[in-house]
């Protein structure tokens, strides 16, 4: 009961925060990255697996979808394979995962430590920013075509927290 109330409350807060941010910044589409078996195949340690798999992600995604659509914001769930491995700044090609395929892909950058991704040019970028940008790029190929300077992605110091 306590757990359900906590996640219902947190889901509502997250959904409201995203909806409010989109309205204030004139954003018309929200793209959420999703993998079908991400909980079943997670291998991040025994305790971390228990904590991660405990979160009702689909319920939270549903709340975000409902809030967005209630104010006319388009909600899209996008398959997100390889978005954390591909380099956004180097414009790596992002393949789609195929079950049973043994194809090896080479990406120009790599994750160097928790939360940091290093590009081919040696630029350090937040790993979540890299992955999220690639999810958007995977859904909308030309999402960033008019932007020439991406330095704001790795020079930003503003932190957003949900309370």
Q: PLM features: what roles do these ranges have?
A:
Residues 1-163:
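Positively charged, helix-rich recognition surfaces that bind polyanionic ligands
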């Amino acid at each position: 009961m306590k757990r359900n109330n906590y996640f219902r409350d947190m889901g509502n807060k997250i959904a409201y925060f995203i909806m409010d941010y989109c309205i204030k910044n004139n954003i018309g589409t929200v793209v959420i990255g999703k993998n079908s078996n991400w909980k079943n195949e997670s291998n991040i340690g025994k305790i971390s697996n228990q904590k991660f798999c405990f979160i009702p992600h689909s319920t939270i995604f549903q709340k975000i979808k409902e809030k967005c659509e209630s104010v006319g914001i388009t909600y899209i769930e996008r398959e997100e394979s390889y978005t954390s491995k591909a380099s956004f700044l180097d414009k790596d090609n992002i393949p789609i995962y195929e079950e049973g395929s043994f194809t090896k892909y080479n990406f120009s950058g790599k994750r160097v430590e928790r939360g940091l991704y290093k590009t081919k040019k040696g630029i350090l970028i937040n790993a979540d920013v890299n992955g999220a940008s690639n999810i958007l790029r995977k859904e909308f190929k030309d999402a960033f075509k008019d932007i020439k300077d991406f330095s704001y992605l790795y020079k930003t110091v503003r932190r957003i927290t949900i309370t």
